[in-house]
Regions:
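C-terminal regulatory domains involved in ligand/effector binding and gene-expression control
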Residues: 1-76
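Glycine- and Gly-Pro-enriched alpha-helical subdomains that act as flexible
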Residues: 95-98, 105-137
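Short flexible coil/turn linkers enriched for glycine and charged/polar residues
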Residues: 21, 50, 90-92, 133
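Conserved small/polar residues in nucleotide/adenosyl-binding loops
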Residues: 140-141
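Short beta-strand/turn micro-motifs at beta-sheet edges
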Residues: 11-15, 83-86, 127-128
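Solvent-exposed alpha-helical segments within well-ordered globular domains of core cellular machineries
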Residues: 34-41, 45, 84, 114, ...
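Ordered, amphipathic secondary-structure segments that act as subunit-interaction surfaces
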Residues: 66, 73-105
Length: 141
């Protein structure tokens, strides 16, 4: 068991507008993959009319579970940048869904990578970062 790890304090949402495309990052703490999948399904239902609902999550003490999806965006331009934000901060037990409403202007692969990555970062900043420490408590009688 790790003595300390990084996660988020709360669930949160943040929004970014990039060339008329609207990006909504929703972030939530998750305990396991089933909880992450339920959260993703909830966001897809909430934002059913969105162009894309991209996700990434990282779960486990040693990040044993890492998943991401581009949800129809060009390969590697959406889910990977979101996962990279989680990996870069070593943020565990966290799921991020970035919803995109297309604004009519193509962003290009570099623009997509930057927009999805920035959206995820804004969502995590809004949620707040927490350091979790495990302690042993001994009781003598």
């Amino acid at each position: 068991m790790l003595d300390e790890y990084t996660t988020i304090l709360n669930g949160a949402e943040a929004e970014l507008i990039e060339k008329k495309s609207r990006f909504i990052a929703t972030v939530r703490p998750v305990k396991d993959e089933n909880e992450a999948k339920a959260f993703i399904a909830e966001m897809r239902k909430k934002y059913w009319d969105a162009t894309h609902n991209v996700f990434a999550y990282q779960i486990g003490e040693r990040n044993e579970i890492q998943r991401s999806s581009d949800d129809g965006e060009p390969q590697g331009t959406a889910g990977k940048p979101v996962l990279d934000v989680l990996m870069g901060g070593d943020i565990k037990n966290t799921a991020v869904v970035v919803t995109r409403y297309f604004g009519g202007t193509l962003l290009g692969t570099g623009g997509l990578v930057r927009a999805y990555g920035r959206s995820a970062k804004l969502g995590i900043e809004e949620a707040g970062i927490a350091k979790v420490r495990h302690y042993n408590c001994l009781l003598y009688t």
